[in-house]
Amino acid sequence: AVLSEEGIPAYSVSREGYFETYEVSVLLDYLKILDNARQDLPLAAVLTSPFGNLTPAEMAEIRTAYPNLPFYEAVRAYAEEGGDSGNEGMAAGRAFTGESGRESDSGRDRALWRKLERFFDQMAHFRAKVPYTPVHELLTEIIETTGFGLSVAAMPAGAQRAANVDMLVEKASAFEGTSYKGLFNFVRYIGQLRKYDVDYGEAGVMDEQSDTVRIMSIHKSKGLEFPIVFAAGMG
């Protein structure tokens, strides 16, 4: 991070932590909720990602409005309340039964409703394709049509993040070449890899000849020759 801040290109290949990178974990969480939306942690992660763009305050607003419902049901109820806001009879009935702790549909509420409407419309679109679309094709469409790929590429270390996303698509394509196919099986397969600490390591974005600072362990550097070497943490 320090080298990047100073404008010095640096490169370090990680042999672990691929599934824990932000961009990969969010994409996997999105696949999880396409398979089964009633998973609170993946749903919360996706809603606060570029897919949903919800703020912590908006997440708290949903939970406050429906404190006794499971989170997925609370989000759906909040979204449906926004869709029904023009129906006076339903709004009055909701106020009478006390289903929601909300008292008005302020501008902030309407902005949140629009976010949720867009989010669930996208989910419905992709979920309809799950039965007949190979996972790697589904992933590619999700990345491209939602703007997720552009979002992660614009983040710090964007080239590395984009390479990690591309690598996930490649892994999904390779998986489709096995006897196991479909979203459910792919999500389960990744879950098993994570359970047994099987990690791919982050995707490589530079070749051996790149004009850059290469960060590596002493063990990994054996047999290599560099004109300048900094050995950090020696005492």
Could you say what each language-model-derived stretch is?
Residues 1-65, 73-76, 90-92, 96-99, ...:
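Conserved motor-region signature of P-loop NTPase helicases/translocases
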